Amino acid sequence: PYRGIVEGFYGTPWSHEDRLSMIGFCGDVRMNTYIYAPKDDSKHRDQWRELYDDAEEAKLTELIHACAENNVRFVYALSPGLDFRFTADGYEADFEALMAKYDSLYRLGVRDFALLLDDLPDRTAQAAIKSR
């Protein structure tokens, strides 16, 4: 069973040090999962097609290693629903962008991924996406 924390909230964001501390806490209390989905990471949601730069990759790698050291599964969650094109005219390009993003994270050591399609402003679009 999964026992852990989802960092996927609105409000005051966690610092990198806060994240490392939370991962240590997870290990201390035998939680086994940390889901990275911070709303303040624009490359998680608003600019999801963009790859992380070297400095951002270094921080993610540090989180991944901290999780491994604490027996905590690191799950990278991506939230592309605001502008992912689910229609024929844009689907292939967006699917390729999604795979490029996941491939770049896989190279960093991420082995568990989540695709978040919640918090969409248009409930009709959210229903259409979930039914695919």
Labelled PLM ranges:
Residues 117-132:
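Active-site cleft segment of glycoside hydrolase catalytic domains centered on the general acid/base Glu
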Residues 1-111, 116-118:
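Feature activates predominantly on carbohydrate-active enzymes
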